[in-house]
Every structure is written in structure tokens, then in C-alpha cells.
């Protein structure tokens, strides 16, 4: 699918995906989306982002929904609008690398079930991790939008991103996304980067940012002046703060100018009324904390994405160590430097953040490592952008050999194994893919479906427990460590929304907290 020549600023609305992922732990239900689809479909958006990211995990883990059924229902309800998803390259929607046969089948099934645009990113900007997803998206007729995971470091500058964009165009990109997940792209750098990209590559430029630091609106405006083709916004009930800038505000700002989006403010207001009731429900249930709507300039200082901030707070609450919050924020950029300056986006944001928490709570840097930190330093996630602190790497992995090839080249085909493991629980190839990404969670879902608890094809949801009903976390003791490891405790806390499955990490947090209480070591 090729784009028509751009003549105005086009809008992708994230209300059905990143808006509630960024603000409300990805807890919007399908039944809350469908009533608004008729008006959304008439809006004239370039696309609606509605799938991928953490929505897949959240559907199965928390909402008792089949994510594939959600996609099919949305496609039926939005016949005139492109549906867009976020795809983590070789990680697909999970937190590890998958073999190419799994990547191909997922691209194929996503497009068959209704996805039009696949935005593909790699946390390390390692293009080797994007090759297969790009190839298979194009093979099955999808619009391929590789993303530049934007960040700031001694190795990430304008020339770096222009070079990366050119390589992605050569690989077959239909458009290029500047993915500013941490709201670090300030207005003037945005203007300059978009200007360069428009001058040096010949595909549309799509800008994704957030409003965590309060600069998102200005960044979008300057990008529009520089000639950006498409921008991401979110309807106001779930816009701004850690989400995207509000759609209505940008539409009103540009109305009557050469950048006029063509969207109708009255229609947007009508759609917003519906999502205001959804936002109210998310607040009542404790998933939408008003804090995520405020401006937080710590992102500019510590380069920590908004969603990562909320995850750090959750982890520190688990360890009864909220007073260490600013110590952890200061430790994050130090860990990032030691790890070779990875951009802080899933899964590296969680990995770096978790290691920073461990370093602070243990009272000693790198006294313990998560297995994911070891994997990053071993090269299992791909090529790190900058120079790694070799002393830290040696402490983490000893004499293990560092992977220098494309990590997926070391993986054998996996689909047949997943099919055999799931057996009769699988009703479709889509079920096999769900199991491949989240085996324990998906299997539990399929068993419930088989037993009639989740009717096949239904999108009935389980209402999450309001925050007021959640038991307060108490200081970690030996007896509580085991309970923290239990699935029930993790699910009730909501900490796993959008996080990689770091079950052993909860135990490490408790151990580190205990060590910190008895240690006099300075951090």
C-alpha cells in the first residue's frame, strides 16, 4: 500500500492503543472501544493505532479477552480507516527474540485479521532485528513503517538518525516513523531532523511523541512547519501527560492554515465524550492515576520515559522503598551508559530500570544482575549502540562469548514446537501465536475458554479490582517473598502490565531491600 502525495498534515490517533497504554496500564476493554467506532471511522484519520504494544499481553493477562478477536471486531467496525499496530521487530509483541518462522506467521495473520500499517521498531536500532519483520510485512501486503527509536546520547545525533532512516528506506520502508517514546525530542531538534529527513529520503515522515515534559505540542507544531507528513495524537480524555498531545488542540491550532488537518472539531468533541466515560472508569478502578497527566521535567534530566517512571514507582512500592525514587532516577543514566547507551524503550527501558533499582536497593552497584541485564550484555538482544563498560560486562557474564551475529540467526524454527505444546487447546493458528508470545498466560486463557469460563469468540471482560480493594504492600520478610512470587500477587498489583516477565526480579527486590537496610555502603 503506497501513500498518496501529502498536501496537509495527517493524523494518527492513538486512543485505542498507546493512549491508554501510557496512562492506564493498557486496561481499555474492547466493549469500551466499539461504541465509538462509527464516529471514529467517519473522522478522516490517516490511521487509528489500535493493536500491538502491550495490548496483546493485557488482553490475555488482565482483561480475559482474545486479542485477535479484538482486532477482527475493530476491523469490522472501522471499515474505512487504516488500522495500525506497533511491532517490536524480532521480539514481535513479546520480550525475547523469536525465530523467523514465528515472525512471518505473525505478520501474515496480523494483516489477514485486519492490520493495514505495521510500525516496526527495535529497542537498540539494530536494523538486523528489523529485517524479517520488514520483509514479511511487505510480502503479505501491509504498509511497512520502520521506526527510529529516538534518544539522546554521545552516539545518537542527527547524522545517526538520518543514516538509519536511509538504510531503512533501502530495506523497503513505505514511511519512516520518528519514535520519540520518552518525549526527549524538543521542538527545534524536531524541526531540524524532519527538515533533513524530508530533504534526504523520499518516503513520508511520521512523528510519534508524548507530552510528559509539556513540550509535545510544540514539537508537533515545529515538525509540521518542517514538513512532517503524519503525526500521532490522542483524543483529549486520554491525551497529554504521559500520552500523546491532544488531537483536538492540534486540529484547532492548524485550522485554516496550510497545515489544516481537515478533521472536524465537533466530531472530535463527540468522540471525546465517549472516551471521557472510559477515562472516568479507569480512574475509579485505580488504573488512571492523575499524576500521569502532570508535567514531569525529570524526563529531560534523566531521559526516562513516562511509562518507565510509573513502573519504577511500582517496583519501589513492592520493595517498600519509595524514598529511593530519586536515587534510582539518578542511577538510570549511569546504568544506561555502562550498557552502551541503549534507547529506553520496551524491553530495554524495563531492563535498565530494573537494574538501576537493584543497584540502589542493594547498596552496591552491580552486586546482583537480572537475567535480562546479562542477556543484553551478552548480545542476545542485538548490537548495543555505544561502548559497553567491559568491567560491568565481565562481572555480569564472566567469560561467556558475546554474540556478534544477528541473534535470530541462532534460533531454529519454532512454530511446530509451539503447535505440539499447545495441542488440542489451539482452535486456530492465531492461538498458536498467542501461546508463542505468552505461553503461561495464553494457556491459562485457552483452558478457561475450553471449560466455558471464557466463551469462545466472546469479548467478555473481567473487571479489574479497584485500587482501593488492593491490599497495601508490606515490608518484605522471608515469608512474604514467596507470596510476592505468586501469580496472584503480581496480577493484583498490576505491576506486570507492559513489563517483561521478570518473576525472579521480585525476589531480588526483596533481597536487595533487606541488604540495603543492613548495609552502610554509599550508593
Positions of PLM-derived features:
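N-terminal amphipathic alpha-helix/helix-capping segment at the start of soluble metabolic enzymes
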Residues: 2-24, 71
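Active-site beta->alpha loop and helix N-cap motifs at the rims of alpha/beta catalytic domains
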Residues: 52-144, 148-164, 186
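Hydrophobic faces of well-ordered beta-strands that scaffold small-molecule active sites
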Residues: 11-16, 48-50, 81-88, 118-119, ...
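Conserved, mostly hydrophobic/aromatic
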Residues: 19, 120, 176, 227, ...
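Glycine-rich phosphate-binding active-site loops on the catalytic face of alpha/beta enzymes
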Residues: 180, 226-243
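Catalytic cores of alpha/beta
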Residues: 160-164, 214-226
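Terminal or standalone catalytic/regulatory effector modules within metabolic enzymes
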Residues: 41-59, 289, 293-299, 303-483, ...
